[in-house]
Each structure stands twice: as structure tokens, then as C-alpha cells.
UniProtKB/Swiss-Prot annotation:
Record-listed [4Fe-4S] cluster binding positions: 154, 157, 160, 221
Domain 2Fe-2S ferredoxin-type positions: 17-98
CDD domains: fer2
Main enzyme class: oxidoreductase
SUPFAM superfamilies (alphabetical): 2Fe-2S ferredoxin-like (SSF54292), alpha-helical ferredoxin (SSF46548)
Family the UniProt entry places it in: Belongs to the succinate dehydrogenase/fumarate reductase iron-sulfur protein family.
Protein name: Fumarate reductase iron-sulfur subunit
Annotated GO biological process: respiratory electron transport chain; tricarboxylic acid cycle
EC number: 1.3.5.1
Length: 245
């Protein structure tokens, strides 16, 4: 073992809402830090050697699936992309993300929220044209394809929702993920909906007009999506529709 290795302390808020006797409490774990150790690696070592009951989510381990998002020292992050060495004092406090239903410990149900959001903004291409799978796909200009791709990189991790002050106060708020999803289809030429159609979906206080422009979503997005400009553009377009009514 190298003399340069240090011992880190990981504090986890543990709670099983399905238990009649379990109460929320912090539990501390100490472990030796290794080079390039991520929180994901640390949590796996804790579960393997210290606490097999510890619950947290992961799938890809590469910042692609978004499953391992959690509150790290008060900020939503992906465990698989967060190095333990980035915390100088070696003390890391982990909690489940707010605004989502708690499953157990660090595991939350983001799936139901994103499923509901998908239905609310009707996030699929709307077209009056009858589908004909024998036809060549409609040509899309490279600039448009790039703009759509940029907004479509969302991995549904929930970091933007967990960091949103409006979401904490307004449970039905659609959040940055919902507004970004709406904008993604507004700029897609495959979708034939008008701005008026989108206004019916996101043109209220639970939609784009509920945003307080704190931009925590933009600051915490692990994929660095252009949420600030996306939300601003959506708000301007919805404002024009509202004024015309």
C-alpha cells in the first residue's frame, strides 16, 4: 500500500421507506482511496466489504445511462463520473435526489417521473401524414440535425430536476428536462405541431412560465446541455403566443 493513499469518509443517508421501524440516519464508512477512484467504485467497495444492504443504482458506469445520479455534498452528480480525489478533505456526504420517489437509501424512482413528463409534452413527432415505411426518410439539413441532436443528448439522470428550486416548491413543474424535451421537438421539422400546440402543453406556471431562471439546471447538467438558451428560446416563443391570444 502506498504512503500517498489516504482514508476517505463516505457518509450515506440511509432510509428504507418500506420499513415500519427504519428511520432516516447517516452512516459513515471509511475506506482507502485508490488512484482514479470514483464514487461508483467507492460505493461498490462499501457494499461488497462493509454494508451489503446499501442501495444505489447503476448500469453503464460510463456517464451514459444516468442511473447513478445522487446528491454529493449537496449537489446532484453522477457517481460514476465523480472522482473522490476532487474532495480535498476526504469527507463525502451522499443523499438521494429530492423531487423523486425514494426507493431506498440512494435509490430513487426517476423512471415514473420521466415517463409522465414524456406524456405531458407529447414527446414524439406529430405528423398528419400517414406512415409509409417503404418511403425514404425525410431529408434533414445538417444544421437542424445537429441542433436536434444537441438537445436530444439528455440521459434522463434527473440532476436538473433535483437542483431546481421551482420543482421543490411546485410539484407539478415540468422542469428543465421537460422544457428541453419540448424544445427538441419544436425545432424538429418532422414534428408538424405549431407553437400554439406547444403552448397548450407548456405555456403555464407548471411549464415554462414557472421557471424562476435560477439556472441551477444548466450548472449541474452532467452532459452540459445548453439548457439556459433552450429554456430562454422556448419562453420567448411561448410568450409571443400568449400575447397574441
Amino acid at each position: 500500500m502506498s504512503d500517498n493513499e489516504r482514508t476517505i469518509v463516505v457518509r450515506v443517508l440511509k432510509f428504507d421507506p418500506q420499513s415500519a421501524v427504519n428511520k432516516p440516519h447517516f452512516k459513515e464508512y471509511q475506506l482507502k482511496e485508490t488512484p482514479s477512484m470514483t464514487l461508483f467504485i467507492a460505493l461498490n467497495l462499501i457494499r461488497e466489504h462493509q454494508d451489503p444492504d446499501l442501495s444505489f443504482d447503476f448500469v453503464c458506469r460510463a456517464g451514459i445511462c444516468g442511473s447513478c445520479a445522487m446528491m454529493v455534498n449537496g449537489r446532484p452528480r453522477l457517481a460514476c463520473k465523480t472522482l473522490t480525489s476532487s474532495f480535498e478533505n476526504g469527507v463525502i456526504t451522499l443523499m438521494p435526489m429530492p423531487s423523486f420517489t425514494l426507493i431506498k437509501d440512494l435509490s430513487v424512482n426517476t423512471g415514473d417521473w420521466f415517463s409522465d413528463m414524456t406524456k405531458r409534452v407529447e414527446s414524439w413527432a406529430h405528423s398528419k401524414e400517414e406512415v409509409d415505411i417503404t418511403k425514404p426518410e425525410k431529408r434533414v439539413e445538417p444544421d437542424e440535425a445537429q441542433e436536434v441532436f444537441e438537445l436530444d443528448r439528455c440521459i434522463e439522470c434527473g440532476c436538473c430536476i433535483a437542483s431546481c428550486g421551482t420543482k421543490l416548491m411546485r410539484p407539478n413543474f415540468i422542469g428543465a428536462a421537460g422544457m428541453n424535451r419540448a424544445m427538441r421537438f419544436m425545432i424538429d421539422s418532422h414534428d408538424e405541431r405549431s407553437d400554439d400546440d406547444f403552448y397548450e402543453l407548456v405555456g403555464d406556471d407548471d411549464g415554462v412560465f414557472g421557471c424562476m431562471s435560477l439556472i441551477a439546471c444548466h450548472d449541474t447538467c452532467p452532459k452540459e446541455l445548453p439548457l439556459q438558451s433552450s429554456i430562454a428560446t422556448l419562453r420567448n416563443r411561448m410568450l409571443k403566443v400568449g400575447k397574441s391570444r
